[in-house]
Amino acid sequence: MVMTDPIADMLTRIRNANMVRHEKLEMPASTIKREVAEILKREGFIRDVEYLEDSKQGTLRVFLKYGASNERVITGLKRISKPGLRVYAKADEIPKVLGGLGIAIVSTSKGVMTDKEARQQKVGGEVIAYIW
């Protein structure tokens, strides 16, 4: 089966595993998925991420993070720019998610980064997703 939107698939896998409080999940790896997972780790939304090499494209293993009383760290994920409707924003038009409590992941000419980093570097790009 051909996957038309690998980022939406990644976000859905994370959302589903998070809802049933799984400790980890695995998915087929790609460069953009690895970059998004590293951002989620750096921003404290997931505990860890591993890349497992195999004969094909590799596997990405994501370890989810939960609070002290097992509450979810990720409360929501939303795909913004889709293959059928791309969403682009200039540096000064990149939206803040929940007044700065969440992050927007933006694909720019300087790589994949958070909305805050894109504003600091004054670069716009494709708004991939919101995470809060």
Curated annotation (Swiss-Prot):
* Disulphide-bonded residues: none
Any idea which UniProt keywords this protein has?
Ribonucleoprotein, Ribosomal protein, RNA-binding, rRNA-binding
User: What Gene3D superfamilies does this protein map onto?
Assistant: 3.30.1370.30, 3.30.1490.10
User: Which SUPFAM superfamilies does the UniProt entry name for this protein?
Assistant: Ribosomal protein S8
Superkingdom of origin: Bacteria
A biological process (GO) of this protein is: translation
A Gene Ontology CC term for this entry? ribosome
GO MF annotations in UniProt: rRNA binding; structural constituent of ribosome
Cross-referenced HAMAP family: Ribosomal_uS8_B
Protein role: One of the primary rRNA binding proteins, it binds directly to 16S rRNA central domain where it helps coordinate assembly of the platform of the 30S subunit.
Family label: Belongs to the universal ribosomal protein uS8 family.
Subunit notes for this chain? Part of the 30S ribosomal subunit. Contacts proteins S5 and S12.
Q: What is this protein called?
A: Small ribosomal subunit protein uS8
Per the UniProt record, the source organism is: Exiguobacterium sibiricum (strain DSM 17290 / CCUG 55495 / CIP 109462 / JCM 13490 / 255-15)
The gene name on file is rpsH
